[in-house]
Amino acid sequence: MPVLDIEDFADALPQYAAVVGLDPGEKTIGVAVSDVTRTVASPLALIEKTKFSKDAEQLFKLMDSRGAVAIVIGLPMNMDGTEGVRCQSNRALGRNLLRLKPDLPITFWDERLSTAAVTRVLIDEHDISRKRRDEVVDKMAAGWILQGALERLRGL
């Protein structure tokens, strides 16, 4: 199965099953999970990047533990709508995950400003220290990304 656009992704999903959202960074991958009705996204975990095979194994274990059947990967588009180097890296992640699980539904979601928005909320509304923000911002950004995709899926 190729990486899908959001409409084909919706068609590939069973009626009730969780989906995970990923916010891949240079050193970590933020992971969020939806409920089985795909209404609410919640931050789940932070995977410290090591080797792709180990990272993928950890991701698949998280997915299995939550009954997740598909992945939404954040795509950090430039403000003008073009794709930069990080987009290429995230697209490669999607392709590599499909090599391990060819039938896994995967789509991308524009994550522009997700990390900045989450950081602003953590500072303005929760007064969280920089150290604590660094620990939670990626998985919260994954939740932000996944929630955006879930809202789009509900509109289809």
From Swiss-Prot:
The keyword ATP-binding is assigned to this record? no
What are the GO BP annotations of this UniProt entry?
Answer: rRNA 5'-end processing
Family, as annotated = Belongs to the YqgF nuclease family.
Q: What is its main location?
A: cytoplasm
Q: What is the species of this protein?
A: Caulobacter vibrioides (strain NA1000 / CB15N) (Caulobacter crescentus)
Question: Does this entry carry the keyword Hydrolase?
Answer: yes
Give the keywords, sorted: Cytoplasm, Hydrolase, Nuclease, Ribosome biogenesis
What PANTHER family does the record tag this protein with?
POLYNUCLEOTIDYL TRANSFERASE, RIBONUCLEASE H-LIKE SUPERFAMILY PROTEIN
Please list the GO terms describing molecular function: nuclease activity
The record's listing under InterPro entries reads:
RNaseH-like_sf, YqgF, YqgF/RNaseH-like_dom, YqgF/RNaseH-like_dom_sf
Supply the name of the protein: Putative pre-16S rRNA nuclease
Alphabetized CDD domains for the sequence: YqgF (cd16964)
Provide GO CC annotations from the record: cytosol
Name of the top EC class for this enzyme: hydrolase
Function (record text): Could be a nuclease involved in processing of the 5'-end of pre-16S rRNA.
Task: Name the domain of life.
Answer: Bacteria
Q: What is its EC number?
A: 3.1.-.-
Lineage of source species:
Bacteria, Pseudomonadati, Pseudomonadota, Alphaproteobacteria, Caulobacterales
Query: Where, per UniProt, does this protein localize?
Result: Cytoplasm
